[in-house]
Amino acid sequence: MLARNFLETWCEMLDWDELVRREGTAVWRTIYRLVRNQADADECFQETFVAALELSNRQPVRNWPALLQCLATSRAVDRVRKKLRRTKKEEISDLARAETMQPGPAQQAEAAERATKLRWALAQIPARQAEIFCLHELGGWKYEALAERFAMTVNAVGVLLHRTRKKLQDLLSLQGALSESLLKQRPA
């Protein structure tokens, strides 16, 4: 009973509406940039704030923007992985629209293909690596912030990002080689 009263008091002290107003746009952009689908983004957005509430019930939160960005990235990467598993060999064209400034159809198709390939490659690497990579490359997080968030040294973050880039390059090269091989095998 005492714990419940404390929990209710704690939740009342934190103005969730204000937190969502203040951080919601950044959280939404982070999620949508990865999932590229309104329905999936809506679900990830809700899951992010539910997870934040649950975490804040267990321990005090020092940096809400950082926590929300980490949770959002994690939820979005998980969603992409699940979607790729469900649609292993199907085209994921609704996921693959790249952010561009009024490109022509050819540039849109190329950007969509690159985005699809990157999402596929991100789904092949460990979740933590994908999360750190996305926070750095898409979220603009500095090595120091990543080191603090993931309890790593700054040097370890740099090494992990370097290895992740290399692994993604290898996966993308392999995928390109397989695609070319399949195209060559098709009868004319």
Task: List PLM regions with ranges.
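A short, charge-rich alpha-helical start-of-domain segment used by transcription regulators
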Residues: 3-29, 39-42
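Amphipathic, Lys/Arg- and hydrophobic-enriched alpha-helical face
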Residues: 19-38, 54-55, 122, 174
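Σ70-family region 2.3-2.4 aromatic/basic alpha-helix that recognizes the −10 promoter
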Residues: 46-53, 62-82, 161, 165
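Arg/Lys-rich amphipathic alpha helix in sigma70-family domain 2
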Residues: 70-91, 111, 174
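DNA-recognition helix of helix-turn-helix
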Residues: 73, 77, 150-179
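Internal acidic/polar
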Residues: 86-111, 142, 182-187
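Helix-turn-helix DNA-binding module
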Residues: 123, 127-128, 139-156
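A short pre-motif secondary-structure segment
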Residues: 132-136
